[in-house]
Amino acid sequence: MTIGIAAHGPNAGLAVYRSLRATERVGAGSIGGFASFGAISADGKLMRYETQRGGTSTLFIEGEITGTDPPPDVATAASAAVISSGPDRPQPEKLLAADTLAGLVTGHRMPMTTGADGISVNQQVLNLMKGGHSAQDAVDAVLDRNPEVDAGLVAVDRSGQVYGRNSARVLRRPDIAEARASRAGASVIVFYNSIRPHTVLAALATEIALDIMLGLPKPDGQVKVNAGTPVIPGRERAVYCDANNVAIHVTGHDFELVSGQGHCTGIDLGSPVYKGSKLIGHTMFETKIIFRDGKLAFVSDQKSVSFGYRRALAELTCP
């Protein structure tokens, strides 16, 4: 088995699916064949799906349509995992261990290999999590006892911890890759081998999963910038608003912007937004402007534009 992905967070089911799909589309090698997918909803429902050929293009079906996104209850699941490789793997249900009370165990190489205790190593991890061990404690305990097993294991427990580790044997391979990311309550781990280009795809897969789970940040407020707004000299590109969040002037440090005329980026992404002397946030939008003699003539080819800002972490006063 060449790739294992596990995630916990909002829409983890969709995140794991899209992460695998992106890897199939960009990568080459032993991928796009069988897939065994599992997800656990917030209320503890286990949902499993399998395919032997086609990977994500046949994993989920809606009527006569293949290659669809997971159904809503799967897409919104809080924990999800998948293991995938080339086509036609025997007993795919044994390659991803799952239990509603414990969590999910995926991985790459041969996670169903029987370990020193006479039980497959992925099932050993699941059994330990059933007994109350965290994902990290369970994976470490099993791989400490089985350093030469041909497996990398990735587990997500019911508390939401996602943890992965390769055995000493797998770490000696020249073609393995992994990536881990955790941000704002969302976590994902990707392990794989035998997929090219093997040094870069893992990071892509994790970022795609995180992007699905975290989504686009929502603005804390809106700023309105109208044509005719003055541009005055300042050491930064910034927007200064009145009590109604309408721009009263924009600052810039470019001589041409203040005194000439032309076309340029006027308000940068992440520009400070002030209400009076108080920093209230940073812009989530970038505008292009046409300016004439120190005033905005057009903002993103319009006479008036509203865009969002994210709230500042601390209240500051402008210099």
Regions found by a protein language model. Give the residues of each.
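N-terminal nucleophile
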Residues: M1-P319
